[in-house]
Swiss-Prot record:
GO molecular function, one term: nucleic acid binding
Family classification: Belongs to the TEFM family.
Protein name (record): Transcription elongation factor, mitochondrial
Gene3D superfamilies from the UniProt entry: AF1531-like domain, Ribonuclease H-like superfamily/Ribonuclease H
GO biological process per UniProt: mitochondrial transcription; positive regulation of mitochondrial transcription; transcription elongation by mitochondrial RNA polymerase
Main location per the UniProt record: mitochondrion
Keywords: Mitochondrion, Mitochondrion nucleoid, Transcription, Transcription regulation, Transit peptide
UniProt cross-references to SUPFAM superfamilies, sorted A to Z: RuvA domain 2-like (SSF47781)
GO cellular component term of the entry, any: mitochondrial matrix
Keyword Repeat attributed: no
Compartments, record wording: Mitochondrion matrix; Mitochondrion matrix, Mitochondrion nucleoid
């Protein structure tokens, strides 16, 4: 039996009859379906998956990976259990199950091309799977990625994880409509300073920038030096027009704190002032009821008591200051000075969530 076959001769296509079983026909057929590709020298390929011609060009998987890499990939595919395969992110769910089922029915994979016979495995995903097997995410790498994601949700602006981990002390600052409070803690969770001050005149009059500058500068002069200054990121919604004066006050205060405390930013571009998610602190201390954060007064009261009663309290108040701090707390019990409580809780949460 013969079939027509096309050959390019003298720049024109011509038809020649060839036997179906002819080795020449097979060679020509393979030549038409596959172009030459040069295999990289023992490197993991970085394929542009947006290029739809990758498969059409005939680049077989076996030519994209060295023999050693192929052996490593096949060893995992042929020996790993369903649970072990799910350790690779791209193989979770149905894909790992399908690999195991395919092995049971057809035996071990003989080459990488055979992986595409498994349901859900197309050309692009197969290359990604092979790369992930060669470069699995280690436990340490996963932990770093998780910590980086947490930091992005917890604090703004984004800063290097290494800078956060190396912090020695912070000043946690919480401002309200009438007062501002701060807590200075080191990485041993020792409370080095904790106080509040009032600034009643700021929300009176025309919200003059010069008045804010004078008032906030005076307050900052009382604050201790630290590696980071952590502000509470919160404020009323834009959707309520009646709260616009309060919102304006919060933003002006925040802007002043960012400008006056970021003393080296112009030189090195490094942020020293950060804003921390208020609700994240509330969740950490179980103060949230739905979307509403409740008072942290009782938590602070318990921390003060534990510092005296326990050998290893959660927070350490220096003996020479504990009496003053307890008196300060007692004097605010009737007024519920939330800024004072929140500044301490925010500092503790920063260390426990971002540093430790």
């Amino acid at each position: 039996m013969t079939v027509p076959s096309l050959l390019l001769a003298g720049g024109r296509w011509r038809c020649f009859p060839l036997p179906l079983a002819s080795s020449l026909f097979q060679a020509l057929h393979n030549s038409c379906c596959r172009k030459e590709s040069t295999a990289p020298k023992k490197i993991i390929p970085h394929i542009d998956f947006s290029d739809e011609t990758a498969k059409e060009s005939g680049k077989t998987l076996d030519k994209l990976f060295s023999s050693e890499q192929q052996a490593s990939i096949l060893h995992v595919l042929n020996t790993a259990s369903n649970k072990e395969l799910e350790a690779f992110k791209l193989l979770r769910g149905k894909k790992s199950f399908n690999i195991v089922e395919h092995r049971k029915k057809f035996g071990p994979f003989q080459n990488l091309e055979s992986l595409m016979n498994v349901p859900l495995f197309q050309y692009k995903i197969t290359i990604q799977v092979c790369n992930s097997i060669l470069n699995p995410e280690t436990g340490g790498k996963k932990k770093k990625l998780q910590e980086s994601r947490l930091l992005r949700k917890l604090i703004k602006p984004e800063i290097g994880r290494e800078r956060v981990k190396a912090v020695n002390s912070i000043v946690s600052i919480v401002s309200g409509t009438r007062r501002i409070a701060w807590a200075h803690l080191d990485r041993k969770l020792a409370v080095l300073d904790w106080q509040q001050t009032e600034y009643c005149q700021l929300m009176k009059g025309s919200y003059l920038s010069s008045v804010y500058l004078e008032e906030i500068s005076s307050i900052i002069s009382k604050m201790p030096k630290a590696d980071f200054y952590v502000l509470e990121k919160a404020g009323p919604s834009f959707q309520n027009p009646s709260l616009f004066p309060v919102l304006l006050h919060f933003h002006m205060t925040e802007a002043m704190l960012y400008a006056l405390l970021n003393t080296t930013f112009a030189q090195d571009g490094h942020h020293q002032v950060l804003s921390m998610n208020r609700n994240a602190v509330g969740k950490h201390f179980e103060l949230m009821i739905g979307d509403t954060r409740t008072s942290g007064k009782e938590v602070v009261k318990q921390l003060l008591s534990e510092s005296v009663l326990k050998d290893e309290p959660r927070v350490f108040f220096p003996p020479e200051k504990i009496v003053r701090y307890r008196q300060m707390f007692s004097s605010t019990e009737h007024n519920r000075v939330e800024e004072l409580y929140d500044s301490l809780l925010q500092a503790i949460a920063f260390y426990e969530l971002a540093v430790f």
